[in-house]
């Protein structure tokens, strides 16, 4: 049973659970997740281990991509240059680890900037990485999924607050009607899994 959100709760609308659930990851494969936010660029490369993941490599850099965005409505030349430099390091790590399954996303700064889509094209040209500018709803969805391992059998309601550099997402989910043994897994079904990409 899919987790439910009370009507009128004021949280972001979360789509119903996708069915069937994503195919379980292969233990020999590496997976990567990259989050390009308003202030920082972060990436994790991990390998499935048991019911979780073992981190193989990681990267985090303050790029201040959203610096000056409030005044100009655009990403500045300096912030884009800093970000490109950080993403080149990420690309090298992905290639060195031979990662083929990944999800690379950009959030609020690129959503709001008039030149956000243009910057995504530049990133692909200069680094070979294809980033998706995701909507606030999907950003909130991913935040909820990341909390799934913290959900235990006694959890009835879940409030997730994702505070970023340029936006804050809140999601309230009622999982009281989901069988206790399935509660964490039902949250994982909120998303369609990972993407395969070239580096």
What does each model-found stretch correspond to?
Residues 168:
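Active-site or pore-adjacent capping/gating segments
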Residues 1-36, 44-163, 171-199:
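Nucleotide/phosphate-binding catalytic cleft detector across ATP-hydrolyzing
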């Amino acid at each position: 049973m899919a987790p439910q959100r009370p009507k009128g709760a004021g949280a972001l609308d979360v789509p119903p659970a996708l069915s069937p659930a994503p195919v379980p990851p292969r233990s020999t494969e590496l997976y990567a997740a990259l989050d390009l936010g308003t202030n920082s660029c972060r990436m994790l490369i991990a390998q499935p281990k048991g019911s979780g993941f073992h981190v193989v490599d990681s990267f985090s850099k303050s790029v201040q991509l959203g610096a000056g965005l409030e005044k100009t409505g655009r990403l500045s030349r300096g912030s884009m240059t800093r970000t490109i430099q950080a993403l080149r390091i990420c690309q090298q790590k992905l290639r060195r680890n031979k990662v083929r399954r990944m999800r690379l996303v950009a959030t609020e700064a690129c959503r709001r900037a008039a030149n956000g889509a243009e910057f995504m094209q530049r990133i692909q040209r200069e680094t070979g990485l294809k980033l998706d500018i995701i909507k606030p709803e999907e950003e909130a969805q991913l935040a909820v999924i990341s909390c799934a391992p913290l959900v235990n059998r006694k959890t009835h309601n879940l409030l997730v607050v994702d505070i970023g550099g340029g936006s804050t997402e809140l999601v309230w989910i009622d999982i009281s009607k989901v069988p206790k043994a399935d509660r964490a897994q039902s949250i994982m079904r909120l998303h369609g899994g990972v993407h395969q990409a070239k580096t």
